[in-house]
Amino acid sequence: MEGAPQAAYFNNLADQWWANDGAFSVLHSMNPARISFIKKLVNQFFPKNGLKNLNVLDVGCGGGIVCEPLARLGAKVTGIDASEQAILAARAHAHEYNLSIQYECKSLKDIKRSYDLVTCLEVVEHVDNLSDFIHELTKKIKVGGTLILSTLNRTVFSYVVGISGAEYIAKKVPVGTHDWQKFLEPFELISIVEKYGMKAVSLEGLNYSLLKREWYLGGQLRMNYIVGFQKKILD
């Protein structure tokens, strides 16, 4: 699912981006762990000011789940998405909470500037021409800048839990959201990204604690994971 069909799919879910127990509730519950990873990596490569005034591009931003906490932490955030309805939902929610975020319904190729940080979370598993997409992502990053990706590993566990469990049994995710064949093992994703002048600098699992009922960083990589890259500084 990519391009117009993907945009239409998420257009139909636009009213659920900020709904309690809606179609994106899993992303909301995962978000504190994802933001923690982002903060840690940004503080490593931008130790002086961290996220404050950092120019950030969030690709596949949806309703703004990642953009909003980054903006609250002081970043100058642009979010892009192919779904016009998702962008409208993102703008409305940001306006409601008086957040200054630039949301645009456009493709990655239409972005003509570069950023300190590019995030693309839970997106690459929906992309058909992945190598071309990754190449475009890397073009939007300044030398020395950072790219952060998160996605699902292609394992038996991710099929049983991520698709059969989440989509068909628990119904936490709409049926048809994921195609297991598009899930990527970490080494596959890293090898694609590193072809385009990037270096993997951090890889962590994203796991769910049934006891604490929350997502956390660390542990196994058998389902969700998040990986950070730095654009190589030329000698």
Task: Name these PLM-found stretches.
Residues 151, 171-188:
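Acceptor-substrate binding/catalytic loop of class I
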